[in-house]
Curated annotation (Swiss-Prot):
Comp. bias (Basic and acidic residues): 274-284
CDD domains membership: T-box_TBX6_VegT-like
Biased composition (Low complexity): 325-339
DNA-binding region listed in the record: 100-273
Identification of the protein by name: T-box transcription factor TBX6
GO terms assigned for molecular function: DNA-binding transcription factor activity, RNA polymerase II-specific; RNA polymerase II cis-regulatory region sequence-specific DNA binding
Cystine connections: none
Predominant subcellular localization, coarse grouping: nucleus
PROSITE patterns, per the entry: TBOX_1, TBOX_2, TBOX_3
InterPro entries named in the record: p53-like_TF_DNA-bd_sf, T-box_DNA-bd, T-box_sf, TF_T-box, TF_T-box_CS
Biological processes annotated in GO: cell fate specification; positive regulation of DNA-templated transcription; regulation of transcription by RNA polymerase II
Upper lineage: Eukaryota, Metazoa, Chordata, Craniata, Vertebrata
Subunit structure comment from the entry: Forms a dimeric complex with DNA (in vitro).
Length: 436
């Protein structure tokens, strides 16, 4: 075991262990109690560490003035004026949307806080004057508690309901234009509309963390500094506006505040009368969801007086009923009645899109009467719908090219619907997997 004198020779020979104090802890044996005493750290023992520094003379005069540092962000200093603490002479800040804030303050402003973060409305929008046009400044904003009480909505007003929750971590919002010259800040109003409030203590995005049902007030800081992380502050000023006091909530408690937010917030126009998010539209959407999906309406297009429309056949193809006994000979063409609904069907196209682009020329030849397939030696597949293609040039039973105008049959899964083209032709299995 090393003696402290061996571990710290720089402390000098005067370093010694303190004597045992009366009434010491009896948990250590008397032989070891002396070895666990803290050394007496008087002034001579620290001279070896402070040899390069001279002791400042003690005088009764006041210390010379030092440059003021900004107060800790998130803490509320004791301002000398009701609204601002100045170390930037001649600088003034005014609230641009003061009338809007006053309208909300007369009712009792509430700000929604969420886990993901919610923007403030109204937002702090200020104008600054009196800055040095060439100097660079930072604009900061934090939110401080107004008092040490927790509030509760009593139906008509807010009333204190107990002691406030412990203080949350202090955070500061830095305006994205910082640092910028005084001319930049004075050119137009400065808006803090991107500030977000959250109630998540583990928020990783830097949003301002607040307690629900507590009263807060935004505070704006103007700091003269050349860099964002500069330690050389040239002065700062803090501004507060009594109209901006609000109570943080997770849901609006005062119905009048809800109406004001909808009427004044341009992003809440959907909640206004006849908007997409008004109560009437929300109730209608809920009813539609409870009813379930509505079945697709299919119109009966068999009436002859129906002029044209979704079921109007404009492709020139005819559809006839499939009757194996009355099937025509391969060289015989029989006129079929006009189709009841010969227009293209979106459902048929989704099931069998290949039928709308002509059959491929490599498909085997089948006759409409479901005989044994001579080319494959196996029986015809279940529920086949035959696609008969016109004869091509050169005497072949297959067309030389796909038809110029594709047909548009209505395929229904599980049933054959042959086409009135001359046989033989290709086929498609309607009951099989769609050919994409």
């Amino acid at each position: 075991m090393y003696h402290p004198r061996e571990l710290y020779p720089s402390l000098g020979a005067g370093y010694r262990l303190g004597p045992a104090q009366p009434g010491a802890d009896s948990s250590f044996p008397p032989a070891l109690a002396e070895g666990y005493r803290y050394p007496e750290l008087d002034t001579p023992k620290l001279d070896c560490f402070l040899s390069g520094m001279e002791a400042a003379p003690r005088t009764l005069a006041a210390h010379p003035p030092l440059p003021l540092l900004p107060p800790a962000m998130g803490t509320e200093p004791a301002p000398s004026a009701p609204e601002a603490l100045h170390s930037l002479p001649g600088v003034s800040l005014s609230l641009e949307n003061r009338e809007l804030w006053k309208e909300f303050s007369s009712v009792g402003t509430e700000m929604i806080i969420t886990k993901a973060g919610r923007r403030m409305f109204p937002a702090c929008r200020v104008s600054v004057t009196g800055l040095d046009p060439e100097a660079r400044y930072l604009f900061l904003l934090d939110v401080i508690p107004v008092d040490g009480a927790r509030y509760r909505w009593q139906g008509r007003c807010w009333e204190p309901s107990g002691k406030a929750e412990p203080r949350l971590p202090d955070r500061v919002y830095i305006h994205p234009d910082s640092p910028a010259t005084g001319a930049h800040w004075m050119r137009q109003p400065v808006s803090f509309h991107r500030v977000k409030l959250t109630n998540s203590t583990l928020d990783p995005h830097g949003h301002l963390i607040l307690h629900s049902m507590h009263k807060y007030q935004p505070r704006i800081h103007l700091v003269r500094a050349a860099q964002l992380c500069s330690q050389h502050w040239g002065g700062m000023a803090s501004f507060r506006f009594p109209e901006t006091t609000f109570i943080s909530v997770t849901a609006y408690q005062n119905p009048r505040i809800t109406q004001l937010k909808i009427a004044a917030n341009p992003f809440a126009k959907g909640f206004r009368e006849n908007g997409r998010n008004c109560k009437r539209e929300r109730d209608a959407r809920v009813k539609r969801k409870l009813r379930g999906p509505e079945p697709a309406a299919t119109e009966a297009c068999g009436s002859g007086d129906t002029p044209g429309g979704p079921c109007d056949s404009t492709l020139g193809g005819d559809i006839r009923e499939s009757d194996p006994e009355q099937a025509p000979a391969p060289g015989e063409a029989t006129a079929a009645p006009a189709p009841l609904c010969g227009g293209p069907s979106a459902e048929a196209y989704l099931l069998h899109p290949a039928a709308f682009h002509g059959a491929p020329s490599h498909l085997p030849t089948r006759s409409p009467s479901f005989p044994e397939a001579p080319d494959s030696g196996r029986s015809a597949p279940y529920s086949a719908a035959f696609l008969e293609l016109p004869h091509g040039s050169g005497g072949s039973g297959y067309p030389a090219a796909p038809p110029a105008v594709p047909f548009a049959p209505h395929f229904l899964q599980g049933g054959p619907f042959p086409l009135p083209y001359t046989a033989p032709g290709g086929y498609l299995d309607v009951g099989s997997k769609p050919m994409y």
